[in-house]
Amino acid sequence: SLGGFLKGVGKALAGVGKVVADQFGNLLQAGQ
């Protein structure tokens, strides 16, 4: 179903966003 598909996409984007945010945080800490 479309709702299930969108929920899956949302979960994937949230997972990717978390990884990117963690990496960005590490870069900021390393730059200080």
Curated annotation (Swiss-Prot):
It is found in: Secreted. GO terms for cellular component: extracellular region. The keyword Secreted applies. The modification Glutamine amide is found at residue 32. Its main location: secreted. Expressed by the skin glands. It comes from the Eukaryota. The keyword Secreted applies. One of its GO terms (biological process) is defense response. Keywords: Amidation, Amphibian defense peptide, Antimicrobial, Secreted. Belongs to the frog skin active peptide (FSAP) family. Dermatoxin subfamily. Antimicrobial peptide. This is Dermatoxin-J1. It comes from Phasmahyla jandaia.
